[in-house]
Structure formats: C-alpha cells, structure tokens
Amino acid sequence: MGPQHLLALVVVSILVAAGNAYYEIDDDSVTRALRPSVIADQEHAVHAIPATNFISKDEDHSKNEKKEIEIIRIAIFSLLVVGVFAIMALRCLPFCL
C-alpha cells in the first residue's frame, strides 16, 4: 500500500464521516415528519385553534440545544475516526517508502 492509497483512505474516511453526520442529523426531522400523529395533525390543522400550533420558546430552545449536542458528538466521533486513520497512515508510511 503506497502513500497515495493511505491518503485516499484518509480522504474517503473524512467524506464518509461527514456524510454520516449530515444524514444522521437530517434523519431525525424526516422521521418526526412521517409519524402518524404528525400527519393526522397536519390533516386536521384547518380545525385547530392557531394558538395551539405554536411551539413555545422553551421547547424550541431545548430542541436547538439537543441538535447542537448531537452535532458536537458527531464531530468528535468523526475526528476520532479520522485520527485513527491518520495514525495508521503515519505508522505505515516508513514501510511504504
């Protein structure tokens, strides 16, 4: 395995980690939108009182905090994965030359 292969492995691992982070965050909103209760609420939204459809600022703030924590957790995991591949590449580099 040459240095080009190790570099390609590191680049691919970064792209995979970034893709997983994006889809893991986006998947929660898609899952929430497809729940039967949410669909039923959307179908009967015409009959609902508008004041009940508003999300309180506390709920919105806690959702943002959870999303920020999730982003940080995924970023740390991605850095760990990339770090492991970088260490492997540096250890194998003298044998490849």
From Swiss-Prot:
**Record's signal peptide:** 1-21
Q: What are the protein's UniProt keywords?
A: Host endoplasmic reticulum, Host membrane, Membrane, Secreted, Signal, Transmembrane, Transmembrane helix
State if Membrane is listed as a keyword: yes
List membrane-spanning regions. Answer: 69-89
Q: Superkingdom of the source?
A: Eukaryota
Please report the record's description of how this protein sits within the membrane. Answer: Single-pass type I membrane protein
Q: Please indicate the residue ranges that the annotation assigns to the motif RxLR-dEER.
A: 32-60
Q: Name one GO cellular component term.
A: host cell endoplasmic reticulum membrane
Q: What does this protein do?
A: Secreted effector that inhibits stress-induced relocalization of the transcription factor NAC069 to the nucleus, thus affecting its broad role in abiotic and biotic stress responses.
Q: Domains: what does the record tell us?
A: The RxLR-dEER motif acts to carry the protein into the host cell cytoplasm through binding to cell surface phosphatidylinositol-3-phosphate.
Subunit notes for this chain?
Interacts with host transcription factor NAC069.
The entry sums up its family as follows:
Belongs to the RxLR effector family.
The name this protein goes by in its record: Secreted RxLR effector protein BLR05
Protein encoded by which gene: BLR05
